[in-house]
Amino acid sequence: LINSIKKQDYPQDLITIFVVADNCTDNTAQIAREKGAICYEHHNPDERTKGFALKYLFEQIQRDYGITSFEGYFIFDSDNLLKKDYISRMNDSFDAGEKIITSYRATKNFSENWIASTYALHWLRSIRTRHRARSFLHLATNIQGTGFLFASEIVKDGWKYTSLTEDRALTADCVVEGYEISYNDEAIFYDEQPVSLKVALRQRLRWSKGHLQAFAESGWGLFKNIFIDTHTQRYDDDKWYNYTWRTIRHRFMSFDTFAQLLPKNIINIFRWIIVYLILYPFFCSQFGLDNIRILYNSTWLAHGITHIFGDITVSLPAGAETYVL
């Protein structure tokens, strides 16, 4: 990663490389320093997420340099590689006024096995259906862990996102504050994907937990913004229709991000319990059933069973004694 940064076509005297060696027991810190990076070592077994490492890093930057002494910050994972013009492309968006920008995530090990390939397709789907579409409409896309740039003003008070998915928390908080998260399709970096099913499942579980944490932290703020927008800035020379368009866009960005974080599966589980295990048995005990189909062709399994055996129906007379849950 450090070598690929040093090979950028962007002026090297304008780049400062910080590395946080998070609970490392190898010679990561030594190698980083030998390569010319400023390395901070973080040792705390109770703080093992990436968010805590970044929190510690920005605390050290604030102490030694001042966070706002730099215009912006890139976030990368240690296994990332950058295309030669990556920083220049991202800087073009930054100079155009964008405050937080994500980029094109390519896969280093696409052909290693089927797990890496499916991850690569997952990120490609995200690029095609999430980043490009939202960026075209000037809405907020979402940060995905690595390969993004943000203005120092966003973390002027330090890094506060320490949940399991700090990227989702950052996304939600920035949208709440009225920032448009843009996407640069020409800035390409390469990321290594998991090749172990165990690692992939553990990562997915971490993502699921992190999404719930991000919703708990920022869900209410996003929901309020849908109806009461207090963060869209109004300029002195603003035409009324320009401000109206920006506030409508911010409300829709809040709704979009809220919908992405909303734990729909958990809500569906509670709905299933209330409707099918409580209300429906009560209805049946009071009014009975008359030739009600058990299976509907909503799944391939149900379709196959009904194709072989035909419609399976049930009839029950009314009365609590004839219908027992």
List PLM regions with ranges.
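Short aromatic/hydrophobic "clamp" motif used to bind/position activated sugar donors
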Residues: 73
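Acidic donor-binding loop at a coil-to-helix junction in glycosyltransferase catalytic cores
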Residues: 164-170
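Membrane-embedded multi-pass helical conduit in multi-pass membrane proteins
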Residues: 260-325
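A conserved acidic beta->alpha catalytic loop
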Residues: 21-29, 44-46, 81
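Long helical/loop segments within the catalytic core of UDP-sugar-dependent glycosyltransferases
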Residues: 41-66, 70, 84-163, 175, ...
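Short, acidic, metal-binding catalytic loop of nucleotide-sugar glycosyltransferases
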Residues: 3-14
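The conserved acidic donor/metal-binding loop of glycosyltransferases
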Residues: 77-81, 174
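Catalytic donor-sugar/metal-binding loop of nucleotide-sugar-dependent glycosyltransferases
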Residues: 138, 171-190
